[in-house]
Amino acid sequence: YKAAANGLLQNETLTAGGTKKIAHWKHRYPIATYLICFAVTNYTVFNNSVQLGSTILPMQTYCYPESLISFQNGTQNVLDAMQLFHNTFGDYPFIKEKYGHVQFGWGGGMEHQTSTFIVSINEGLIVHELAHQWFGDKITCGSWEDIWLNEGFATHLSSFYLEKKYPANTIINRKNLINNITSQPGGSVKVNDTTNVGRIFDGR
């Protein structure tokens, strides 16, 4: 088994006569408690990198063995989005460490700092979660009542990326999305009931 976490892997130590392994990770940036993560399973690991100015940023993926090819095929989209956001908003916030994906079995994704947990390598989803590294991780809302700030920026930036890459399709899709949202009654950007996880992440 392999362990994935925030930051950089420092070392792995075998114990119990070589039957167990301890993985030591270190993250050197301030972090909100809800962004701390680790996962352990029979991951396959592959590495890549992206040039950001004068820095070569390691890109590290922990995925299920059966998902390796799809994650490898989707890597270029991550590199493209990383360069776009880096050039638009300044340095990737955790440029002295890494960015990567850790596959998990839930739907969607979670923007854990330096290590996004993700179910699949869907282009729109990976861009949305990457955008959170700037808006949601480096800076985050002071209360769950204002989570729309994190999600609003990430949603906007995924559209920003897709518009650059697929300009004609994105305009049509964006109009359809807006029509779908505005045709529904109710909804509020502010979350009044922060005890309801479903409400916190409700798009309405």
Model-predicted regions and their roles:
Residues 1-127, 156-159:
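Hydrophobic helix-coil surface modules that form long, contiguous segments used
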Residues 66-73, 144, 196-204:
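Active-site rim elements
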